[in-house]
């Protein structure tokens, strides 16, 4: 009888330890997930910035990687990638380097086409068109004989100029993950076609699918903040071996490098 009571007590003790351990792990996971979401929320607060000139006066996260005299450079990038079934993959996007020291901005409009040769090897062909930004206007710095392409470049808008994540804190049922070895972290949310940002993308791009996208937020570096690492977002409409349709975007604040182009 005594042996039976001891055995029962031992089993209860083991179960209690497992339960407490599980609660501790769950609490840590929930706390980290909340920290990851808050980290992304701070990153997304830069959306909406309609006037690109505002970045000259916008301060970003600074750490020991910055020289005290360096005001930093904002790097903004938007790209639409479309690969219909049976066709080549094509991406069209732009990158700008907004230097807060010199208050000048330069970058490139980039068109990339990925083809597959007869042996099944992928080939990438990329064309860059240098640009500058003045008074919130994109200006090609070299002659462009193709009027349609020139107009596309001059009328280009970055996602940060029309995207808005004011309701991000209300996003539910996200798939949040963390890899401490890199470190890297991510969050995924299934959107619907009534989402404001999805509507804005469909308004500006010919997206050949009615499928609603998944929003993927990806980051690397210290969760508490670091100029080393990256954060970017992606709206994935279709992703498989035959067809890919997605929009990617990033806004980063980095130490200035005068040779960026």
Swiss-Prot record:
<feature type="signal peptide">
    <location>
        <begin position="1"/>
        <end position="22"/>
    </location>
</feature>
<keyword id="KW-0564">Palmitate</keyword>
<protein>
    <recommendedName>
        <fullName>Uncharacterized lipoprotein SAOUHSC_02788</fullName>
    </recommendedName>
</protein>
<dbReference type="InterPro" id="IPR007595">
    <property type="entry name" value="Csa"/>
</dbReference>
<feature type="lipid moiety-binding region" description="N-palmitoyl cysteine">
    <location>
        <position position="23"/>
    </location>
</feature>
<dbReference type="Pfam" id="PF04507">
    <property type="entry name" value="DUF576"/>
</dbReference>
<keyword id="KW-0732">Signal</keyword>
<dbReference type="GO" id="GO:0005886">
    <property type="term" value="C:plasma membrane"/>
</dbReference>
<keyword id="KW-0472">Membrane</keyword>
<dbReference type="InterPro" id="IPR038641">
    <property type="entry name" value="Csa_sf"/>
</dbReference>
<keyword id="KW-1003">Cell membrane</keyword>
<feature type="lipid moiety-binding region" description="S-diacylglycerol cysteine">
    <location>
        <position position="23"/>
    </location>
</feature>
<comment type="similarity">
    <text>Belongs to the staphylococcal tandem lipoprotein family.</text>
</comment>
<keyword id="KW-0449">Lipoprotein</keyword>
């Amino acid at each position: 009888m005594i042996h039976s009571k001891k055995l029962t007590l031992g089993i209860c003790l083991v179960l209690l330890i497992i339960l407490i351990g599980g609660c501790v792990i769950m609490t840590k996971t929930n706390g980290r997930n909340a920290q990851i979401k808050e980290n992304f929320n701070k990153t997304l607060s830069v959306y909406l910035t309609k006037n690109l000139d505002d970045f000259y006066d916008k301060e970003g996260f600074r750490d020991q990687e910055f020289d005290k005299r360096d005001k930093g450079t904002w790097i903004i990038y938007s790209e639409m990638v479309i690969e219909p079934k049976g066709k080549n993959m094509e991406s069209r996007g732009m990158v700008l380097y907004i230097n807060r020291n010199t208050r000048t901005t330069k970058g490139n409009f980039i068109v990339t086409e990925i083809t597959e040769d007869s042996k099944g090897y992928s080939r990438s062909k990329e064309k860059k068109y240098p640009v500058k930004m003045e008074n919130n206007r994109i200006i090609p710095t070299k002659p462009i004989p193709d009027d349609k392409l020139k107009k596309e470049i001059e009328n280009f808008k970055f996602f940060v100029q029309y995207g808005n994540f004011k309701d991000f804190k209300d996003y539910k049922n996200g798939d949040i993950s963390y890899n401490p070895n890199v470190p890297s972290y991510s969050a995924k949310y299934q959107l619907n076609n009534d989402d404001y940002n999805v509507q804005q993308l469909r308004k500006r791009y010919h997206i050949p699918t009615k499928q609603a996208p998944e929003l993927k937020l990806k980051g690397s570096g210290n969760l508490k903040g670091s100029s080393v690492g990256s954060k970017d977002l992606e709206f994935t409409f279709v992703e498989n071996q035959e067809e890919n349709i997605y929009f990617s975007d990033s806004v980063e604040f980095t130490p200035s490098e005068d040779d960026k182009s």
